Amino acid sequence: MNPAWALLRLASPQLPIGGYSYSQGLEMAVDNGRVDSPDSARRWISDQLLLNLARFEAPLLLAHCQAAADEHWDELRKLCESHRASRETRELHLESRQMGYSLQQLLNGLPELDQPARDFLEHCAEPHLALCWALAARAWQISPQDALAAWLWSWLENQLAVLMKTLPLGQQAAQRLTSELLPLLQQAQQDATRINPEHLGSAAFGLSLACMAHERQYSRLFRS
């Protein structure tokens, strides 16, 4: 079987986990005027990629994928606890939990997930997206690095979809932004791979504040 199919499946917006429902604070940034043009959108996404995802979210997800691939279940359990503790706002916690639950339901109904992974998932009190993404990669025989690349691409694609719904930003402009941001996506993956686990962490105050403000936003399209 062509291995690219599994990777495309994992990164597909058709994966039924509801990623299109969340903006991760971007809708609030548009509402308060911080993001109001392609240039400001590029700055917002670039900062999220290099200052937050590359330093924390991406290496944490990569560690989940590696532990699942190597069957290091105790390590994976510790990573799950770290992930849950790192959700700084109610919306970010619910986003990870709800998307994780949807992916868990999908995996439970598929034959590819092996018994050790099923057992781990069954005894996990609160499966989140990073865990279920790692188990999906294991089930579909996707390497940890490729699983990380798929996750980064899905994140970028979703952010651009949010912009097309909230800004005067058409599909061609979104594709131009994609071309400009792809080198940063590659840099984020490389940084996430090289980072020392002891230095894992970011201080994304702007993201946290945007997500907290989004909880009280009067009119909104997205759940975060």
Curated annotation (Swiss-Prot):
It comes from the Bacteria. GO terms for molecular function: nickel cation binding. GO terms for cellular component: cytoplasm. The keyword Cell membrane does not apply. Its main location: cytoplasm. It holds the Pfam family UreF. HAMAP family: UreF. PANTHER family: UREASE ACCESSORY PROTEIN F. Belongs to the UreF family. Required for maturation of urease via the functional incorporation of the urease nickel metallocenter. This is Urease accessory protein UreF. It comes from Pseudomonas fluorescens (strain Pf0-1).
